Amino acid sequence: MNNNLQGDAIAAAIDVLNEKRVIAYPTEAVFGVGCDPDSETAVMRLLELKQRPVDKGLILIAANYEQLKPYIDDTMLTDVQRETIFSCWPGPVTFVFPAPATTPRWLTGRFDSLAVRVTDHPLVVALCQAYGKPLVSTSANLSGLPPCRTVDEVRAQFGAAFPVVPGETRGRLNPSEIRDALTGELFRQG
């Protein structure tokens, strides 16, 4: 995709996000669906679309660490833990951080923590940079169906009119690894 077409797709996606709606976009392994993390309306639409209970909590993806800082509490991290995290980012490793009381429950669910990732997918980086904040991100698939890996699969599951940022996944076969930022405990193998 040339930069002008990519810019148009990103601008269109931001318009949809500003309407408190859900978009689909390629990530490292599969297409994701996401929305504005600060909009309870948008997050509830995403959860309804995915038939996912709010208490499970969600993942935020960002262009850089600074975008994640308002949503997480990194004050307990040691220098070694920071080094470990930053050696994995940007990339397909998600870390679960303590969440401050100001992080909305529609993001954390029943937890006092939040899963976050700095993506290395250039299209998602550009999208988050243009939007100025992270996105809620979960795999693009309806309950019981496999995650979508192409624009056509997204349209087949969600409908032809569903807003999709066109692009390619990075070809990873597995979803992102998930680890505890403080303990390093592996929650999901990547």
Curated annotation (Swiss-Prot):
Regions that span the bilayer: none
Coiled coil: none
Keywords: ATP-binding, Cytoplasm, Nucleotide-binding, Nucleotidyltransferase, Transferase, tRNA processing
Any GO CC annotation of this UniProt entry: cytoplasm
Annotated signal sequence range: none
One Gene Ontology molecular-function label: L-threonylcarbamoyladenylate synthase
The reaction(s) this protein catalyses: L-threonine + hydrogencarbonate + ATP = L-threonylcarbamoyladenylate + diphosphate + H2O
Compartment(s) of residence: Cytoplasm
InterPro entries the UniProt entry points to: DHBP_synth_RibB-like_a/b_dom (IPR017945), Sua5-like_dom (IPR006070), TC-AMP_synthase (IPR023535), TC-AMP_synthase_SUA5 (IPR050156)
NCBIfam families with a match to the protein in the record: PRK10634.1 (NF007919)
Function text: Required for the formation of a threonylcarbamoyl group on adenosine at position 37 (t(6)A37) in tRNAs that read codons beginning with adenine. Catalyzes the conversion of L-threonine, HCO(3)(-)/CO(2) and ATP to give threonylcarbamoyl-AMP (TC-AMP) as the acyladenylate intermediate, with the release of diphosphate.
Protein name: Threonylcarbamoyl-AMP synthase
Annotated gene: tsaC
